[in-house]
């Protein structure tokens, strides 16, 4: 996981890590983790922080060493990429850029992808993703659809 980071990213993470490793013993406390991540432009929620800490802090001693920190940051960066990919996919479908995917836009893109769908099939796809029932798919609904397993 950490091997997907550039040397520049690793150096940047090391610098941030060191700023919060007050006594220089090579570990930071879980409380300091949120501050470190925010200094690197990430904005994790408390629940996300707790999840990350639980995943990384194998011995449960409340501190995180640098290799653990690198693994965690690499995971977080990977997640950010997929969010950007979803946003890009939404833009492809949202032809007129109004923030919604209509049945006509969905049909157009699916046809370009070689999928010949009936009006009923297109309407069904919209209905499945259309959480608020307004007949079109907004970005939040699209994300939900794309990220649900």
Curated annotation (Swiss-Prot):
InterPro entries: CALM/Myosin/TropC-like, EF-hand-dom_pair, EF_Hand_1_Ca_BS, EF_hand_dom. Ca(2+) 3 binds at residues 94, 96, 98, 105. The modification N-acetylalanine is found at residue 2. One of its GO terms (cellular component) is centriole. One of its GO terms (molecular function) is channel regulator activity. It is found in: Cytoplasm, Cell cortex. Ca(2+) 1 binds at residues 21, 23, 25, 27, 32. Residues 8-43, 44-79, 81-116, 117-149 form the EF-hand domain. The modification N6,N6,N6-trimethyllysine is found at residue 95. Ca(2+) 4 binds at residues 130, 132, 134, 136, 141. The keyword Hydrolase does not apply. This is Calmodulin. It comes from Drosophila melanogaster. The lineage of its organism: Eukaryota, Metazoa, Ecdysozoa, Arthropoda, Hexapoda.
């Amino acid at each position: 996981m950490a091997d997907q980071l550039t040397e520049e990213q690793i150096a940047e993470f090391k610098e941030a890590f060191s700023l919060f490793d007050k006594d220089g013993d090579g570990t930071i406390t879980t409380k300091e983790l949120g501050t470190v991540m925010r200094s690197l432009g990430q904005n994790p929620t408390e629940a996300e922080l707790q999840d990350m800490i639980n995943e990384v802090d194998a011995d449960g001693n409340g501190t995180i060493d640098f290799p653990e920190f690198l693994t965690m940051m690499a995971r977080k960066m990977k997640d950010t990429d997929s969010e950007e990919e979803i946003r890009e996919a939404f833009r492809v479908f949202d032809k007129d850029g109004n923030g919604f995917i209509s049945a006509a836009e969905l049909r157009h893109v699916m046809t370009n992808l070689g999928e010949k769908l009936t009006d009923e099939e297109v309407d069904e796809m919209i209905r499945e993703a259309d959480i608020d029932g307004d007949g079109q798919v907004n970005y939040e609904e699209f994300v939900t659809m794309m990220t649900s397993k």
